[in-house]
């Protein structure tokens, strides 16, 4: 593997008991190792001094320079807790929300180990959605730019032959969705992961929520037992616990979130109580109030995502849809346009709630409330990131009161009602009504195209490619 520049690395991360601070923070871990073969737990605490740089964590200068180039000024809590333990060769369970910097938390130790012993098929990262897989690959390539790391993205919706060619070039890192990876393991001649050194399951709770469990079992059976495994998840459900027992060896658990429903202090959250029949009018009014700012509008269904996109476009807004039934190229194109601000409004199902690399969103509008509090937190977490301020407004109709009260209960606080003048809103009624009629015509054409496609490919059990995309 001549492309990776090999050099001898002395890990600077302290071993257990090598200094006073490390010993005190991990004392219970050592005790658990002595008494039973249970998983260790290393909870992040505010009492330990935060490392000032990635070098403090044991990351070599070459990778530290890459961090600086990417704008990583100081380690995030999940990076500060995970990286030293990963450099010690431990299996890890990382409990952290999206936007916490967890990709670098597993990418940096893997890249550092790759520099010590370069080989093909060194690391495998499994992700629940295609977009997240491309994002992770981009992070690996950026962090590993100085060592010429080669990555292959293996996801559904893309050409199998070109992916087989990419695998034939023996990349260092594979980032994949489970369905398409299993297709290649079963059907691509000469492709094997018998020499794999690192496995990462990112957003494991979503992998299991999307029924990837049986596919993960098949993948795990063909991987070598002698490997390092990192499992990252926003929550620790019973399914995730079962997965970690089946795939990890005496892992350390790192948790950086004391409250799974916690939102950042720079996020201004409110709700808008309104009649269901007037939701479109209120939406247009709010977008006029936030004109010039980037916004994500969350809906519950593909149909509503498309309808609102058509509605807003007819009114002159730069809106673009994002949902799981778009082609892969269309989804990546939508994200690219939104990131570049050539379109400033993204209308999306919950495919955009977690894991996507959208660095700057000013406003989140929950046009349709999510059915659970966890999804609400992930949605509003798309704004007010990296210390910036943000606004999240949720539409609460007469049919949503019970759901909204559950969300407020999970947050542990009552949110303020967004104040506006109803008379000013209803001035837009006639204009929005015309746009609604136009959107109905466009939706009819859209649904006819979808129906033709469904008949062409037939109905029945979801294919692995369909499982490789977010529901909705």
Curated annotation (Swiss-Prot):
Q: What is its main location?
A: nucleus
Superkingdom, taxonomy of origin: Eukaryota
E.C. code: 3.6.4.13
Which keywords are on file for this protein?
Answer: ATP-binding, Helicase, Hydrolase, Nucleotide-binding, Nucleus, Ribosome biogenesis, RNA-binding, rRNA processing
Chain ranges of the Helicase ATP-binding domain? 83-254
Q: Where is this region: Disordered?
A: 1-51, 451-472
Give the InterPro entries listed for this entry.
Answer: DDX47/Rrp3_DEADc, DEAD/DEAH_box_helicase_dom, DEAD_box_RNA_helicase, Helicase_ATP-bd, Helicase_C-like, P-loop_NTPase, RNA-helicase_DEAD-box_CS, RNA_helicase_DEAD_Q_motif
Q: Name a single GO biological process.
A: rRNA processing
Q: Which reaction does it catalyse?
A: ATP + H2O = ADP + phosphate + H(+)
Domain Helicase C-terminal: from-to ranges: 282-426
Q: Name one GO molecular function term.
A: RNA helicase activity
One GO cellular component term, please give it: nucleus
Bias (Basic residues) ranges? 452-462
Where does this protein have compositionally biased stretches of type Polar residues? 20-29
* Compositionally biased spans, kind Basic and acidic residues: 10-19
Q: Which residues bind ATP?
A: 96-103
Where found, per UniProt? Nucleus
Location of the motif DEAD box? 202-205
Tell me, how does this one assemble? Interacts with the SSU processome.
Q: What does this protein do?
A: ATP-dependent rRNA helicase required for pre-ribosomal RNA processing. Involved in the maturation of the 35S-pre-rRNA and to its cleavage to mature 18S rRNA.
Query: Which comment does the entry carry about domains?
Result: The Q motif is unique to and characteristic of the DEAD box family of RNA helicases and controls ATP binding and hydrolysis.
Q: Could you tell me which PANTHER family the record lists for this protein?
A: ATP-DEPENDENT RNA HELICASE RHLE-RELATED (PTHR47959), RNA HELICASE (PTHR47959:SF20)
Q: What protein am I looking at?
A: ATP-dependent rRNA helicase rrp3
């Amino acid at each position: 593997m001549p492309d990776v520049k090999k050099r001898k690395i002395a890990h600077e991360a302290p071993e257990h008991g090598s200094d006073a601070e490390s010993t005190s923070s991990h004392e219970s871990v050592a005790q658990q190792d002595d008494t039973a073969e249970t998983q260790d737990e290393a909870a992040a605490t505010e009492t330990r001094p935060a490392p000032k740089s990635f070098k403090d964590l044991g990351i070599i200068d070459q990778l530290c320079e890459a961090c600086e180039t990417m704008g990583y000024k100081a380690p995030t809590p999940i990076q500060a807790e995970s990286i030293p333990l990963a450099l010690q060769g431990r299996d890890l369970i990382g409990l952290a929300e999206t936007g916490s910097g967890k990709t670098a938390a597993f990418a940096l130790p893997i890249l550092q180990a790759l520099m010590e012993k370069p080989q093909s098929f060194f690391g495998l990262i499994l992700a629940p959605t295609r977009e997240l897989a491309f994002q992770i690959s981009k992070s690996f390539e950026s962090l590993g730019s100085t060592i010429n790391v080669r990555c292959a993205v293996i996801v559904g919706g893309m050409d199998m032959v070109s992916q087989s060619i990419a695998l034939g070039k023996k990349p260092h890192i594979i980032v994949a969705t489970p369905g398409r990876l299993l297709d290649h393991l079963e059907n691509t001649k000469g492709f094997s992961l018998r020499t794999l050194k690192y496995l990462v399951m990112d957003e494991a709770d979503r992998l299991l929520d999307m029924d990837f469990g049986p596919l993960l079992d098949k993948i795990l059976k063909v991987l070598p037992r002698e490997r390092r495994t990192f499992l990252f998840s926003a929550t620790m459900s019973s399914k995730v616990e079962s997965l970690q027992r089946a795939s990890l060896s005496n892992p350390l658990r790192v948790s950086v979130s004391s409250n799974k429903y916690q939102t950042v202090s720079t996020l201004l959250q409110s709700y808008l109580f309104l009649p269901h029949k007037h939701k479109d009018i209120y939406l247009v009014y709010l977008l006029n109030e936030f004109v010039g700012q980037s916004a994500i509008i969350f809906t519950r269904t593909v149909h509503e995502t498309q309808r609102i996109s058509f509605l807003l476009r007819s009114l002159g807004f730069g809106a673009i849809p994002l949902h799981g039934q778009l082609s892969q190229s269309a989804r990546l194109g939508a994200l690219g346009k939104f990131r570049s601000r050539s379109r400033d409004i993204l209308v999306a199902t919950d495919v955009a709630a977690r894991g996507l690399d959208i660095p700057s969103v000013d406003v989140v509008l929950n046009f349709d409330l999510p059915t659970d509090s966890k999804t609400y937190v992930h949605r509003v977490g798309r704004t007010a990131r990296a210390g910036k301020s943000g606004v999240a407004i949720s539409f609460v109709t007469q049919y949503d009161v019970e759901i909204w009260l559950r969300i407020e209960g999970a947050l542990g606080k009552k949110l303020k009602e967004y104040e506006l003048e109803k008379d000013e809103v209803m001035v837009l009624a006639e204009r929005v009504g015309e746009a609604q009629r136009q959107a109905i015509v466009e939706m009819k054409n859209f649904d006819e195209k979808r129906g033709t496609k469904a008949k062409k490919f037939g109905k029945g059990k979801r294919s692995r490619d369909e499982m490789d995309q977010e529901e909705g």
